[in-house]
Curated annotation (Swiss-Prot):
One GO term of the biological process aspect: ATP synthesis coupled electron transport
Compartment list: Mitochondrion inner membrane
Family of this protein: Belongs to the complex I subunit 4L family.
Domain of life per record: Eukaryota
Recorded GO CC terms: mitochondrial inner membrane; respiratory chain complex I
MF GO annotations: NADH dehydrogenase (ubiquinone) activity
Gene name per UniProt: MT-ND4L
Keywords: Electron transport, Membrane, Mitochondrion, Mitochondrion inner membrane, NAD, Respiratory chain, Translocase, Transmembrane, Transmembrane helix, Transport, Ubiquinone
Quaternary data: Core subunit of respiratory chain NADH dehydrogenase (Complex I) which is composed of 45 different subunits.
InterPro entries: NADH_UbQ_OxRdtase_chain4L/K, NUOK/Mnh_C1-like
Membrane-topology annotation of the record: Multi-pass membrane protein
Organism: Vampyressa thyone
Name this polypeptide is given: NADH-ubiquinone oxidoreductase chain 4L
Task of the protein: Core subunit of the mitochondrial membrane respiratory chain NADH dehydrogenase (Complex I) which catalyzes electron transfer from NADH through the respiratory chain, using ubiquinone as an electron acceptor. Part of the enzyme membrane arm which is embedded in the lipid bilayer and involved in proton translocation.
């Protein structure tokens, strides 16, 4: 495994650990999700370029489209929760606490 692949795997792992550990604020969760999507995009692009898979060359673009949709939905949810409750805690999304 080359050093570049190992760096991308470590970036994904650190983002996943950040998502699991710092779950209190929604903004930090969204940033960790974006880090995971970015590392997946770079890893997928490197694999496709190294293996010369021309049929799979659209997959990273599709992943970027899903990442943009996820970011837009996450930010709109963040704005809605912060205007409704006045804070961006993830625990405000739990409907069982109401």
């Amino acid at each position: 495994m080359s050093l570049t692949y190992m760096n991308m795997f470590m970036a994904f792992t650190i983002s996943l650990l950040g998502l699991l550990m710092y779950r209190s604020h929604m903004m930090s969760s969204l940033l960790c999700l974006e880090g995971m999507m970015l590392s997946l995009f770079v890893m997928m692009t490197m694999v496709i370029l190294n293996t010369h898979l021309t049929l799979a060359s659209m997959i990273p673009i599709i992943l970027l489209v899903f990442a943009a949709c996820e970011a837009a939905l996450g930010l709109s949810l963040l704005v809605m929760v912060s205007t409704t409750y006045g804070m961006d805690y993830v625990q405000n999304l739990n409907l069982l606490q109401c």
